[in-house]
């Protein structure tokens, strides 16, 4: 039987699924309960404080400045919980890149910046059609020599609600996340997402035969993730 790290999280709401656990709580609190060197891959999409934020509200540069201690602590936790060969995929947009990159590189070491051409963008001005992914490859990591840029550029938007609207304002396609974790890990590996959103990473893990730990602070998106997983396991 596949096993994933046990956590003492009696103060947090959580749901157990055959392949992993979804937590409703602050990721910085939850991740500190995970064992060292227990995670095979991190794929996460943090709040976009410049422009669209994690909860769909407009943010500004000052929001990122006050979050520096939070991300320094989080990246140090990434380093602690990851296995030596683990890969990390950390999404950001062009406005947040200058903030995230120095911290990410200092603590984790950035080995590459991937570009996802999403072929569409919001608003009435020149469209933002690209998003960036800070990539860390652990010692001995092997992603199989795949052509990531050409393979992901045509991936389109993710899950929709029953009325056709996206279930999360900044969600990523399941196929995109699935490609990343399949490039970086073998079946049965443990995937961590500290900003779970509407559950794309969880669904990608299920479809690729990986285990998962998902953390989401927003109660509404937590329940959305659980519902999507219920549908996956039917």
What are these regions (language model features)?
Residues 1-3, 7-223:
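Core catalytic lobe of class I
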């Amino acid at each position: 039987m596949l096993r994933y790290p046990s956590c003492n999280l009696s103060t947090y709401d959580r749901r157990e699924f055959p392949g992993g656990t979804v937590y409703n709580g602050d990721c910085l609190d939850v991740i500190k309960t995970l064992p060292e060197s227990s995670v095979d891959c991190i794929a996460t999409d943090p709040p976009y404080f410049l422009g669209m934020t994690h909860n769909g509200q407009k943010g500004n540069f000052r929001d990122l400045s006050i979050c520096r201690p939070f991300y320094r602590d989080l990246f140090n936790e990434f380093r602690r919980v990851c296995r030596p060969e683990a890969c990390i995929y950390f999404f950001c947009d062009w406005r947040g890149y200058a903030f995230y990159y120095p911290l990410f590189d200092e603590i984790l070491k950035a080995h590459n910046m991937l570009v996802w051409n999403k072929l569409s963008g919001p608003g009435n001005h020149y469209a933002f059609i690209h998003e960036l992914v800070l990539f860390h490859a652990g010692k001995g990591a092997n992603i199989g020599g795949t052509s990531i840029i050409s393979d992901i550029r045509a991936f389109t938007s993710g899950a929709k609600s029953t009325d056709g609207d996206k279930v999360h304002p900044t969600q990523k396609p399941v196929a995109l996340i699935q490609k990343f974790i399949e490039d970086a890990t073998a079946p049965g590996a443990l995937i961590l997402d500290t900003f779970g959103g509407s559950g794309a990473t969880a669904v990608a893990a299920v479809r690729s035969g990986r285990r998962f730990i998902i953390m989401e602070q927003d109660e509404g998106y937590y329940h959305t993730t659980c519902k999507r997983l219920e549908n996956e396991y039917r």
